[in-house]
């Protein structure tokens, strides 16, 4: 089982049947069957029309893969599975930090400090930090609009009418949802609570929004304006956005970055950081061998 940070970020599946063969899941759809090693997946997003077998879920649970049932285009999250981490120490630390006003403010300031690396925000109030962040985001939108030649009339988003937005807002929505899924995967895999946010509060995904906001300006916003600048009538903006942002995730190793940044935000020492060891079978001749494979002789009864 690879470390959390070494896994593929996410795989989105819809209108398919998912089963299990040895240590892999199989995804069957109209174009054929694809075999994917379960332990290499960070989070499996199950969209509409997806059937998954009990055996496949058993494998995904054993391998620590996060599973989320989502709506079309991934714009809604209905449910999720277990975490990769089987320890509660990070969850206990998160609860401790968020329950104390002073430590919560310290973590929130660290989050804003990541956005303003050349400035000292250690003495700013939450109100001042929010105002500073709002100005930064507006500036980024204006910059991207000018750079890509895309009209920008503000952020508009209706989760019940994805197609109703203009191309850049559609792309932002789809790209952000993919980013939320990735952040959600890392948070859940570490055994943390998605609802215990430091900046956001009152929602079951508050901490997901906290973490995702750290990376939007560098990833989803530029991707969205790039897609909008190349938009042609009939383009599936949601699909294109997911594909482009996925490439950004993989190329920039964002999953590993999120895992690292969360632990830095919480002040976890390097020697205490999460490291999931591989699960193997012991063999007195061959040493450790792969887990999850049937080693019986096919000719045996």
From Swiss-Prot:
Record-listed Mn(2+) binding positions: 133, 200, 213
Assigned keywords, A-Z: Antiviral defense, DNA-binding, Endonuclease, Hydrolase, Magnesium, Manganese, Metal-binding, Nuclease
Function: CRISPR (clustered regularly interspaced short palindromic repeat), is an adaptive immune system that provides protection against mobile genetic elements (viruses, transposable elements and conjugative plasmids). CRISPR clusters contain spacers, sequences complementary to antecedent mobile elements, and target invading nucleic acids. CRISPR clusters are transcribed and processed into CRISPR RNA (crRNA). Acts as a dsDNA endonuclease. Involved in the integration of spacer DNA into the CRISPR cassette.
GO terms of biological process kind: defense response to virus; maintenance of CRISPR repeat elements
Single Gene Ontology MF annotation: metal ion binding
InterPro entries assigned to the protein according to its UniProt record, in alphabetical order: Cas1, Cas1_I-E, CRISPR-assoc_Cas1, CRISPR-assoc_Cas1_C, CRISPR-assoc_Cas1_ECOLI, CRISPR-assoc_Cas1_N
EC code: 3.1.-.-
Family label: Belongs to the CRISPR-associated endonuclease Cas1 family.
HAMAP family xref list: Cas1
Description of how the protein assembles with itself and partners: Homodimer, forms a heterotetramer with a Cas2 homodimer.
Superkingdom in the source lineage: Bacteria
Full protein name: CRISPR-associated endonuclease Cas1
Cofactor(s) listed in the protein's UniProt record: Mg(2+); Mn(2+)
Signal peptide segment: none
